[in-house]
């Protein structure tokens, strides 16, 4: 598990940074099939062996609302990624098509809400990204439990804004784990048990923020989707339950710490790097 301290307005850029620099998600999946757009029944299907070989980067991205699914999936497609998406009101035919493309490796990103993800079984899943952090610790367990199955390795990456930090404190207490803030610690890190939070490199975040601003403002559809998602997020925040009172106090203390602004250990060049963790 890895937790990144991110401002809410920087989350699009944070997602691009993590996909490129941490997960190293390829733009191409390596799986192709010929389509007959007029007759879907005539589509040539790839063999199971080839499709299975393309799932090593399979990543699911959890967002808070249907509007975020539409917006974020379009941002990722604009960035050149192969993306599937699911939300609650998607019709069953489209839903099945999106899931099948992800399962078979035609896409390697699946953007979903918690409600839409219920009942979906993804046998091979390498990464889970919590774009919007959970307001319920049990939901977090359910999300991250989708990866690292059957003895395989997997990662769960979470973006945590200052407003969401109290929920991370709730999670830490629920899991009974220690929290490590920043990268200056001398402690040996265990990403399977420790709650390690740190910032993303500003240089990389700025580049992806600039890309996002240029491409969203240059695309009227994306700009409209972004506006709708922002309004949806405001309603989501009003309806979500509050964290524990003590968690708000502890979260404020964490934000005030000097270590809170430090780069996450995954981005350092020492023994704590992602490569060293395998």
PLM regions: where:
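Short interface patches used for recognition in eukaryotic signaling and trafficking proteins
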Residues: 1-4, 54-59, 84, 92, ...
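Conserved interdomain hinge at the start of the Helicase C-terminal
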Residues: 1-75
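Alpha-helical interaction elements in eukaryotic regulators
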Residues: 8-11, 15, 55, 65-68, ...
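Short amphipathic alpha-helical interaction elements and helix-loop-helix interfaces
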Residues: 9, 21-28, 78-82, 104-108, ...
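Intrinsically disordered, low-complexity regions enriched in proline, serine, glycine
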Residues: 15-16, 27-31, 71-72, 84-86, ...
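Conserved RecA-like helicase motor core of SF1/SF2 enzymes
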Residues: 74-173
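Arginine-glycine-biased low-complexity disordered regions
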Residues: 152-278
